[in-house]
Amino acid sequence: MTMSQMNQDAEGYFRVWKPEEASPGHQESPEELDSGRMCGHLCRLSPNEPMAQSLVRHEHYLAHRVNIQEGQRIIDLGCGIGNPARSIARFTGANITGLNINAQQLRQARQLTQEAGLSYQVNFVEQNFLKIEFADDTFDGAYAIESTCYAPDLVEVYSEIFRVLKPGARFGVYEAVLTDKYDDNNPMHREVKTNIERGGGLARIHTSAEAIAAMKAVGFEVLAIDDLGARPDQIPWETQLSDPFLEKQGLLSFALLSVFFAARAMPLINRGLQAVVGKLEQMTVFPAGSQKVVDLVVTILDGMYRGGELGIFSPMFLIVARKPEA
């Protein structure tokens, strides 16, 4: 990505999410929502386990719950740069179709998949998951990892997924939601919610109850519900958003570079770096818009971290559902 492209992305985002409009009243289009989305996801953590292994375990667990089998045709909704698609393809032997509306991410996904020697098994399409361009009853299964939360209306996206699944097929999702501990009358809770919405580019973050209701509303049979973020793990999931954790993982330099290359490991950004970036932007060392990008990162990280600590936000609310047999 060039500096001019980064500036365009930053300006485009902030035309959508202005500080004075940080409220549920503004509804972004799916194109606006997806264009600024980070490429990675969060996961549960285990002591002495490398981060890369934790991420893969999180993906494989979802594949297991969806019961993905060798040779099946599976769709990945909001696939990013294809890391879960490649991981699950290797793990299961299934044929994965990754769907994403971001052309730049798809170019990288195809390149990485070719380098991994998996192009025969994993393919990618540039499509909107609110208007999936596949026929009814096409896929043997579907999954989504922290992506369908970007849909303004969960019923709309879930209904499209339901449509393209074969009868009896399963859909598993790690949905990013507000938990039942969220209290809209609590000012701190509302601030956390706003920071997640504004920082993440969400039209509105849904509650766990809304996600479950949306599944049932479109016709899915809900087989399992499990908030993995609420598990009594030795290392809470939000720990991965902290500086000490990433430093231990050896991701410091990668994380700093990621601020400008839309990768996932951006949590090392802090208030001090905000000031430094602002100064370097003034000196034209960094492109225009860099300060806004850093402010954006700090906003969502603060929201997610505090949301995790308070138990009011989970990025891994697992729902496994099935399309009824014909």
UniProtKB/Swiss-Prot annotation:
Keywords attached to this entry: Methyltransferase, S-adenosyl-L-methionine, Transferase
Keyword Cell wall biogenesis/degradation: no
GO CC, alphabetical: endoplasmic reticulum
Documented EC number(s): 2.1.1.-
InterPro entries referenced in this protein's UniProt entry, alphabetically: Erg6_SMT_methyltransf, Methyltransf_11, MeTrfase_SMT, SAM-dependent_MTases_sf, Sterol_MeTrfase_C
GO MF term (any one): sterol 24-C-methyltransferase activity
SUPFAM superfamilies: S-adenosyl-L-methionine-dependent methyltransferases
GO BP field: methylation; sterol biosynthetic process
Uppermost EC category: transferase
Annotated metabolic or biological route of this protein: Alkaloid biosynthesis
PROSITE patterns assigned to the protein according to its UniProt record, in alphabetical order: SAM_MT_ERG6_SMT
Superkingdom in the source lineage: Eukaryota
Role description: Methyltransferase; part of the gene cluster that mediates the biosynthesis of paraherquamide, a fungal indole alkaloid that belongs to a family of natural products containing a characteristic bicyclo[2.2.2]diazaoctane core. The first steps in the biosynthesis of paraherquamide is the production of the beta-methyl-proline precursor from L-isoleucine. They require oxidation of a terminally hydroxylated L-isoleucine to the corresponding aldehyde by enzymes which have still to be identified.
Family: Belongs to the class I-like SAM-binding methyltransferase superfamily. Erg6/SMT family.
Protein name (database record): Methyltransferase phqN
Species for this entry: Penicillium fellutanum
Gene: phqN
